Amino acid sequence: MSNIPAELKYASSHEWIRKEEDGSYTVGISEHAQELLGDMVFVELPEVGDDVNAGEDCAVAESVKAASDIYAPLSGEVVAVNEALEDSPELVNSDAFGDGWFFRVMPTDLAELDNLLDAEGYQAVIDDE
């Protein structure tokens, strides 16, 4: 069974978010998602300064099995990207909730947080797959 940290929020499309001290949110994919995808070989990230919209694809995770779009859980401006993934995409596999994060977004509509799932709700999504 996948690890689902209780302090994070989740999208049903398997992205997670974590609030940072500056008000931005770090975005990554869940341990469950990386297990389904398998070994990462390439990650395409948005650019700092890009505007992203909740529910729209803004990054790509490519593994030995498939390429998968990564969707923005929140609308806002991309304020940081994880450049370490450029040379080490396998960080997504080894530390999905830590060093394997994708990007940070400064949200423009905090009400969108209400559309995200807690750990229990996300577990229910996985169980229904």
From Swiss-Prot:
Keywords linked to the UniProt accession:
Lipoyl
Segments forming domain Lipoyl-binding: 24-106
Q: Which residues carry this modification: N6-lipoyllysine?
A: 65
- What remark does the entry make about the cofactor? Binds 1 lipoyl cofactor covalently.
InterPro entries, per database record: 2-oxoA_DH_lipoyl-BS, Biotin_lipoyl, GCV_H, GCV_H/Fam206, GCV_H_sub, Single_hybrid_motif
The signal peptide, as residue positions, is none
Q: Which domain of life is it from?
A: Bacteria
One short Pfam name that applies is GCV_H
Its GO CC terms?
Answer: cytosol; glycine cleavage complex
Q: Cite the SUPFAM superfamilies for this sequence.
A: Single hybrid motif (SSF51230)
Q: Name any Gene Ontology BP term.
A: glycine decarboxylation via glycine cleavage system
Which CDD domains does the entry mention? GCS_H
* Function text: The glycine cleavage system catalyzes the degradation of glycine. The H protein shuttles the methylamine group of glycine from the P protein to the T protein.
Q: Which family does it belong to?
A: Belongs to the GcvH family.
Assembly, in brief, is: The glycine cleavage system is composed of four proteins: P, T, L and H.
The name under which this protein is listed is Glycine cleavage system H protein
State the taxonomy lineage: Bacteria, Pseudomonadati, Pseudomonadota, Gammaproteobacteria, Alteromonadales
As recorded in Swiss-Prot or TrEMBL, the protein's gene is named gcvH
